[in-house]
Amino acid sequence: MKIIALETSAVTASVAVTEDERLLAQSFQNSGLTHSATLMPMAADLLKNTGLTLDGMDVVAVASGPGSFTGVRIGVPAAKGLAWPGDKPCAPCSTLEAMAWQCAHVGGEICAAMDARRNQVYCARFRAENGALTRLTPDRAMGLDELADEVRASGLPQTLVGDGAHLVQRALEGLGLPCALMPPHLLYQTAWGVARCALRMAREGQLVSAAAMAPSYHRLSQAERELLSAEKRTAR
């Protein structure tokens, strides 16, 4: 099964092509340019350089959130655009699960976390065994104190991954809870992780049409929160 995967949920952008568990190629960019300017040229160049075509892809996958509202709003429509012409099935992947797949080989409990600001993280916890993941919690936004309580209750060391991993590390180590960061090349979001998540979804019959694919924000954007607050003040 060939999968083309897009990752734009944070400051970096990446595109990967895989065949089953095997990574065929990946392009990663952290240049400061906007994802809207870099993503589609990256995808086109990756396919050209590998001698593959979009028609030859079986699945189009994308990190659908949580993450940067702007980034997710770029990635999901881009994936739809790739999928629609050939009516390709799509995998709207949890950004957190995709990151956890990057350390599934480590084993034990994994905490995938992204900085949600205001002393909160988007996070989910998984258990890795024999290269496979079992989800322990849903994706959610929560405070670091609440997450620390949950980890303490588990009683097990945590492998930390994601751009919020350093925040979680400080919170856990401050309470004497054992944890370890993934190395830099596996710490942040990658399209390869998205492709691994998509493969799991495909094998479990969880693919959707391009029309049905939607972002998963888990929280209102700042602009939406400010608008809601203003509407509440006006209604008083």
PLM regions and their residue ranges:
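N-terminal beta-alpha supersecondary unit
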Residues: 1-66, 188
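Phosphate-handling active-site elements
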Residues: 48-55, 84-93
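DPxDG-like acidic metal-binding loop motif
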Residues: 61-90
